[in-house]
């Protein structure tokens, strides 16, 4: 196949030997993740047939005898072109909650003939949701003042944030308030974020920014010195496992949920050790 979501495909197949092409951003994710050790065969994978804007080189894919393409549901026109050439195309969407993520894994399991593995993963998702649902009454009892304001960065340099979808869903589930944009604003600005004054900031692996860059106010053109999360040293770099944990369609999303929950509401989510959870998962699964 040629695809987005190589981390999910690897998780279901247990190998990456049949991956023909992945986007450059997915390749950079491979370089920084444990997938580099688990799937060294991706070192020489093509990154020119599927672009970071998810457009594809239809002719090149046909010449490469690709028998399946996985891409986002925004690429319907190219999917039709591929189908006209006899290349099946599975279109996926960004999960907005854990049910959406389960549906995605099930669909990929069917497409890749990995139904049993997919069922194992969705059972894990169900167990995770059962755990969070068991905390629902405690979370519901929180006052607004007890729910910290949370900002999830996608890319700090570009000032792009996760303002909706599954990350907002998760933040609410664990007792936080996720940053959202006012209706009349389409892109976040420093002014908008300063007005929001996040108490917790999560930064993804789509850039090289570290918490220390915030604490030492090193980010060019941005002054974070008066932001609560920075003053209280509550800026966190999101881990990277098989792939970056922050994006919506990440296989290890339950680990992301438990990791962020232990930061957002440490008193409620205190009945597990996140390092043990992470270590046990990778030992058991791989």
Features from the language model and the residues they span:
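Solvent-exposed loop/turn segments at secondary-structure junctions
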Residues: 3-6, 25-28, 68-69, 74-77, ...
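Short beta-strand and adjacent tight-turn residues that come in two discontinuous sequence segments
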Residues: 21, 71, 92, 181, ...
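Extracytoplasmic substrate-binding proteins
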Residues: 78-158, 180, 187-188, 230-231, ...
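Alpha-helical, coiled-coil/dimerization segments enriched in small aliphatic residues
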Residues: 160-185
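A contiguous binding-surface segment within folded domains or other stable secondary-structure elements
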Residues: 185-237
């Amino acid at each position: 196949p040629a695809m987005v979501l190589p981390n999910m495909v690897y998780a279901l197949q247990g190998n990456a030997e049949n991956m023909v092409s992945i986007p450059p951003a997915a390749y950079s994710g491979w370089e920084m993740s444990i997938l580099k050790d688990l799937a060294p065969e991706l070192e020489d994978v093509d990154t020119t047939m599927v672009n970071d804007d998810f457009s594809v080189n239809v002719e090149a894919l046909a010449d490469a005898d690709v028998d399946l393409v996985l891409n986002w549901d925004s690429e319907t026109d190219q999917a039709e072109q591929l189908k006209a050439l006899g290349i099946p195309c599975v279109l996926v969407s960004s999960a907005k909650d854990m049910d959406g993520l389960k549906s995605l894994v099930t669909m990929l399991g069917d497409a890749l003939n990995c139904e049993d593995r997919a069922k194992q993963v969705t059972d894990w998702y169900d167990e995770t949701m059962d755990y969070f649902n068991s905390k629902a009454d405690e979370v519901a009892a929180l006052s607004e003042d007890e729910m910290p304001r949370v900002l999830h960065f996608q890319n700090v340099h570009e000032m792009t944030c996760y303002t909706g979808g599954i990350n907002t869903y998760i933040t609410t589930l664990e007792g936080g308030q996720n940053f959202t944009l006012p209706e009349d604003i389409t892109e976040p600005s420093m002014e908008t974020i300063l007005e929001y004054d996040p108490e917790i900031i999560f930064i993804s692996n789509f850039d090289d920014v570290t918490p220390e860059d915030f604490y030492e106010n090193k980010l060019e053109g941005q002054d974070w010195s008066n932001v609560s999360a920075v003053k209280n040293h509550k800026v966190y770099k999101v881990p990277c496992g098989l792939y970056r944990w922050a994006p919506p369609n990440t296989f290890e999303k339950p680990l992301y949920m438990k990791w962020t929950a232990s930061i957002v509401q440490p008193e409620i989510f205190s009945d597990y050790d996140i390092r043990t959870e992470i270590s046990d998962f990778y030992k058991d699964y791989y």
